[in-house]
Amino acid sequence: FEKEAEKIKAALGETLVAVHHIGSTAIVGIYAKPVIDMLVEVRDISEVDARSREVESLGYEVMGEFGIPGRRYLRKDNREGIRTHQVHIFAADSAQVRRHLAFRDFMNAHRVEA
């Protein structure tokens, strides 16, 4: 997560506010799928579109909103075509950001439910 987060930070530049580790690999003590999920908060979602080339140079496929209004979705596969990373980008402090982080934090705080 850490190495890839640094690459995303460099590609998105000044608009980036924060990168969070989410998804099953961010929940301690559960069996997780081997895909790193990241939640990225940005100041201006349109800046993400303007930086598509930088993101693609990291090996990501830029998928646009991909079914969720206000989101920018990126995915990355390894050389064998197996998904390794998913990046969900939203405007900083949006309802989607709060929802994703609340779920992750709930699951980490309530191990039985996880």
Task: Describe these PLM feature segments.
Residues H20-H21, H85-H88, H100:
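Histidine-centered active-site/metal-ligand motif
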Residues A95-A114:
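Catalytic cores of NTP-dependent nucleotidyl/adenyl transfer enzymes across multiple folds
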Residues Y60-A95:
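Conserved catalytic core of two-metal-ion nucleotidyltransferases
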Residues F1-H20:
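Helical scaffold of the NTase/Pol beta-like nucleotidyltransferase catalytic core
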Residues G23, M38, V87-A91:
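A structural signal for short, well-ordered beta-strand segments
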Residues I22-V28, R72-Y73:
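Short, solvent-exposed loop/turn elements at beta->coil junctions and helix N-caps
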Residues A50-G59:
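Short amphipathic alpha-helices in soluble, non-transmembrane regions
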Residues V28-E47:
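Catalytic metal-binding acidic patch
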